[in-house]
Amino acid sequence: MVYPVVEAESRVGFGKGFARRARAAGKIPAVAYGLKRAPEHVLLPAAQMSLIMRRANALLQLKIDARESLVLIKQVQRDRIRNIIEHLDMLFVNEDDAVTIRVPLRFVGQSYAGTVTSVENYSVAVTLQVSQIPEALVVDVSGLQAGRRIFASDIALPDGALLVSPPRLLIAKVDPVRRATQEPPPD
């Protein structure tokens, strides 16, 4: 499989002041760890990472000093006010490794007329191979009637994937639309 390649610079400075200067220069401080390797502190290009981060559970080839390693973005720290990425934690992985991650759900279709679908959970935890990580799991609510519930165990998983979330975790429910009752005008 082909993954985006990101050129990373080794990070020599640490602390709040260094991180602020790096972000002002268009870089994101990050750390990559795992696979019994020493953690590597790096700086990543902010513009390129913003594009890659649009996809949940993004995988990328991290190029550090002419070495390439496959990494999974594990945690993102964001400044919600300025809408910037402040720091990334990444996990070194192999394509055949099994990882436990939260996969977002994408809801398609419309429930039966006169009903409304209420979404209770937007992701589920699964264990699967790195090479099989989907962008999202599809939940089809087409034609579901009032009273129907969708649980985590009802979601179709990729081959070889195991559900980690509780099987009875409520994902969505279909309820009848409540009609507004008109009260008689006061006398």
Swiss-Prot record:
Molecular function GO terms recorded: 5S rRNA binding; structural constituent of ribosome
Top-level taxon of the source organism: Bacteria
This protein's UniProt keywords: Ribonucleoprotein, Ribosomal protein, RNA-binding, rRNA-binding
Claim: Flavoprotein is one of the keywords in the record: no
Alphabetical GO biological process terms: translation
TM segment ranges: none
Any one GO cellular component localisation term in the record: cytosolic large ribosomal subunit
CDD domains: Ribosomal_L25_TL5_CTC
Family: Belongs to the bacterial ribosomal protein bL25 family. CTC subfamily.
HAMAP family reported in the protein's UniProt record: Ribosomal_bL25_CTC
Protein's job: This is one of the proteins that binds to the 5S RNA in the ribosome where it forms part of the central protuberance.
NCBIfam families, per the entry: bL25_bact_ctc, PRK05618.2-1
Subunit structure: Part of the 50S ribosomal subunit; part of the 5S rRNA/L5/L18/L25 subcomplex. Contacts the 5S rRNA. Binds to the 5S rRNA independently of L5 and L18.
Protein name from the UniProt record: Large ribosomal subunit protein bL25
